[in-house]
Design a protein with these regions (language model features):
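Aldehyde/semialdehyde dehydrogenase
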Residues: 1-77, 108-143
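Conserved C-terminal structural/oligomerization subdomain of aldehyde/semialdehyde dehydrogenase
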Residues: 19, 67-70, 74-189
Length: 189
């Protein structure tokens, strides 16, 4: 909690610097959402966050882009604070550019908040302390935990969620096991 204000300011500043546009360009940080229905779903979640008392710190609108990108389903990344960890916004899988910032006092408190959701696809732990990174990653109910990174993984490594975030694993030997249908044939002696 002691670093929350400084972290919030730095995080919002970084989000506001993100370049939205053509995902084929190296300079682009965020491309379009997959469809109009997807963008509409994320915008409904933005309305829910407002209704739950969230304070919008940045984003939440459709960016004005060049003519060749106007038909895309773009949405600026949104950052909220002032939302409780157990509100709908923080308990559902949104799959869109929406983040909420929540202060915490210790590891036990933040693990309780993070593990309260019925989902557990992926998580990210950011720290300079290796031992803390290990404790937190082991304590998180998530199928994949990144440490000091996001969206980086070896495609040979198993990937999949826990709880309501999926069944089975993709990637590596775990995927072969998941898609293998064993059959036992028994003959009498």
């Amino acid at each position: 909690r002691s670093v929350f204000k400084a972290f919030r300011e730095a995080f919002v500043e970084q989000v506001q610097r993100m370049t939205i546009g053509n995902p084929q360009l190296e300079s682009t940080d965020q491309g379009a959402l997959i469809s109009a229905a997807h963008r509409d779903k994320v915008e409904r979640h933005l309305a829910v966050a407002h209704a739950e008392g969230g304070r919008l710190l940045c984003g939440g609108d459709r960016p004005a882009l060049d003519d060749d990108l106007r038909e895309g389903f773009y949405l600026r990344p949104s950052v909220f604070d002032s939302l409780p960890f157990d509100c709908r916004t923080n308990q559902e899988e949104i799959f869109g550019p929406l983040a909420t910032l929540i202060p915490f006092d210790d590891e036990t408190e933040v693990l309780t908040m993070a593990n309260s959701t019925p989902y557990g696809l992926a998580a990210s732990v950011w720290t300079r302390d290796f031992a803390r990174a290990q404790r937190m990653s082991e304590g998180l109910d998530a199928g994949l935990v990144w440490i000091n990174s996001w969206m980086s993984r070896d495609l040979r490594a198993p990937f999949g969620g826990v709880k309501q975030s999926g069944l089975g694993r993709e990637g590596g030997l775990e995927a072969m096991r998941f898609f293998t249908e064993s059959k036992t044939i028994s003959w009498p002696r």
